[in-house]
């Protein structure tokens, strides 16, 4: 039958130009300690950026090779609301309302440790924000799609 492969990632921002999570650990949620990674591009949470896009390279701190689906699920669930980039001071409480994840490839076929996350802010108003994300393995192959609605609580 007909088969159409997902478009690969083109020209990802290099890890070497990123800002390591550890550099801003005091401003970030503690669960990020479970991951090694860096923010790339012009936005990161609480940076005051008006960007609608959040990009990062990320991998688990521990070996997840025996848990291929869980490895991708945790990676896909770790990005904060893109809207938090618009704020210049922590903390703005936020919580998931709904989340969906679609695997594009069988998780067992994903062999790398590093993932490139490309998340877009679709809309935000009245305490709700929607975002879409693409999770790529280091080779550039699209692994999964994420869709999330979150509530945020301005003080």
Segments (PLM) and residue ranges:
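Terminal targeting signals and extreme-terminal segments of soluble enzymes
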Residues: 1-155
């Amino acid at each position: 039958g007909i088969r159409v492969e997902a478009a690969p990632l083109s020209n990802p921002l290099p890890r070497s130009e990123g800002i390591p999570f550890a550099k801003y650990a005091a401003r970030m949620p503690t669960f990020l300690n479970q991951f090694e990674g860096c923010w790339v591009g012009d936005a990161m949470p609480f940076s005051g950026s008006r960007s609608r896009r959040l990009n990062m390279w990320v991998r688990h701190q521990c070996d997840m090779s025996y848990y291929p689906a869980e490895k991708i699920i945790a990676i896909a669930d770790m990005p904060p609301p893109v809207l938090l980039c618009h704020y210049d001071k922590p903390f703005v409480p936020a919580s998931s309302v709904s989340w969906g994840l679609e695997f594009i490839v069988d998780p067992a076929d994903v062999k790398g440790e590093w993932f490139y996350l490309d998340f877009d802010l679709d809309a935000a108003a009245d305490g709700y924000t929607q975002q879409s994300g693409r999770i790529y393995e280091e080779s550039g192959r699209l692994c999964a799609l994420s869709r999330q609605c979150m509530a945020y609580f301005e003080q």
